[in-house]
C-alpha cells in the first residue's frame, strides 16, 4: 500500500492525479 509507505519530505515519488510524479521541493 502506497499510503503506508514511508517517504522522504524532499525527494519522494508522490501519487498525484492518478499518476506518479517526482516531488522535489
Swiss-Prot record:
Transmembrane segments: none annotated. Induction: By oxidative stress, primary alcohols, monocyclic aromatics and heat shock. It is found in: Cytoplasm. Keywords: Antioxidant, Cytoplasm, Disulfide bond, Oxidoreductase, Peroxidase, Redox-active center, Stress response. One of its GO terms (molecular function) is NADH-dependent peroxiredoxin activity. GO terms for cellular component: cytoplasm. Its main location: cytoplasm. It comes from the Bacteria. Its EC number is 1.11.1.26. It catalyses: a hydroperoxide + NADH + H(+) = an alcohol + NAD(+) + H2O. Thiol-specific peroxidase that catalyzes the reduction of hydrogen peroxide and organic hydroperoxides to water and alcohols, respectively. Plays a role in cell protection against oxidative stress by detoxifying peroxides. Belongs to the peroxiredoxin family. AhpC/Prx1 subfamily. Homodimer; disulfide-linked, upon oxidation. 5 homodimers assemble to form a ring-like decamer. The active site is a conserved redox-active cysteine residue, the peroxidatic cysteine (C(P)), which makes the nucleophilic attack on the peroxide substrate. The peroxide oxidizes the C(P)-SH to cysteine sulfenic acid (C(P)-SOH), which then reacts with another cysteine residue, the resolving cysteine (C(R)), to form a disulfide bridge. The disulfide is subsequently reduced by an appropriate electron donor to complete the catalytic cycle. In this typical 2-Cys peroxiredoxin, C(R) is provided by the other dimeric subunit to form an intersubunit disulfide. This is Alkyl hydroperoxide reductase C.
Amino acid at each position: 500500500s502506497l499510503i503506508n509507505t514511508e517517504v522522504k519530505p524532499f525527494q519522494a515519488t508522490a501519487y498525484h492525479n492518478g499518476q506518479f510524479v517526482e516531488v522535489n521541493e
